[in-house]
UniProtKB/Swiss-Prot annotation:
The keyword Transferase applies. The gene is prmA. It is found in: Cytoplasm. This is Ribosomal protein L11 methyltransferase. Belongs to the methyltransferase superfamily. PrmA family. GO terms for molecular function: protein-lysine N-methyltransferase activity. InterPro entries: Ribosomal_L11_MeTrfase_PrmA, Ribosomal_PrmA_MeTrfase, SAM-dependent_MTases_sf. GO terms for biological process: methylation. HAMAP family: Methyltr_PrmA (MF_00735). Its main location: cytoplasm. S-adenosyl-L-methionine binds at T164, G185, D207, N249. It comes from Clostridium botulinum (strain Alaska E43 / Type E3). SUPFAM superfamilies: S-adenosyl-L-methionine-dependent methyltransferases.
Amino acid sequence: MNGVWIEVRVITSCEAIEPISGIFYGLNSQGVAVEDPNDLLTRDQGPLTWDFADINVLEHKGEFAVVKAYFSGDDDLEKIVSITKEKVKEIQEMGIDIGKGIVECDKIKEEDWANNWKKYYKPSNITDRIVVKPMWEEYLPKNEELVIELDPGMAFGTGTHETTRMCVKALEKYVEHDSTVFDVGCGSGILAIAAAKLGAKLALGVDLDPVAVESAKENVGLNDLDNIEILEGNLLDVIDGKADIVVANIIAEIICILTDDVSKALNKGGLFITSGIIHERVDMVTSKLDECGFEVMEVNKDGEWNCIVAKLK
């Protein structure tokens, strides 16, 4: 590799940050960094309000976000850029605003990569009680705070996105000490880890992506939890038994595909917490939930995104 890394960037909208980050993790990037000026501007000032520390992004406030991914210098740059452009176009075809949608790339020295990508991640309060911190940062919990430790360069899900925060808030509200929780499309494992830290009897994370599965397992290890398991595969194919709560932070189209399986994986009266739903897709998801025997209890909003909590009748 000769000490060289590839940086691929997409200049996009705040709405498209999550799906574009997902593209890069699907391409097995070694890390993803997000520059979102609006995220900085909408948070209360304080020592834990900064999800990333590059103040220069404020120069672009409200204009655009930038999602950066890092790949080995030995990877096929032309192929990575081509696939990224194709996937960004697919996101646009789903009705998600991609903003400028410009894909750029550069080669950078290894020492620049090693120092630069980590500066974007600092300890962050995702609820009043739960703090997410990267593994290399020190943090002393206050009062009854729960700290989730992550290596955010390994798989999607760092806790900084609106959809993740809303899912964690819902888990905080509904997880009980005898709860069994399934996290579908677990990515980094952050939601399963949150459920386990909140006292769930058992949390199971499942993902189709073997890279995500390995990442989630490593993050579970960082948090020293024994009430959590990470599995590779489809929900009903790999999980036995039923859950009290199923959580899925994905996109509306996939939620609709999963809903019938989720109804079979839940105990009667169980909850389906789901996010990754833009405003234009809320009616589609709630209709599918109703069709599959769910009663919608909550529709929570944060920015461009929605989180739905539904109860199996």
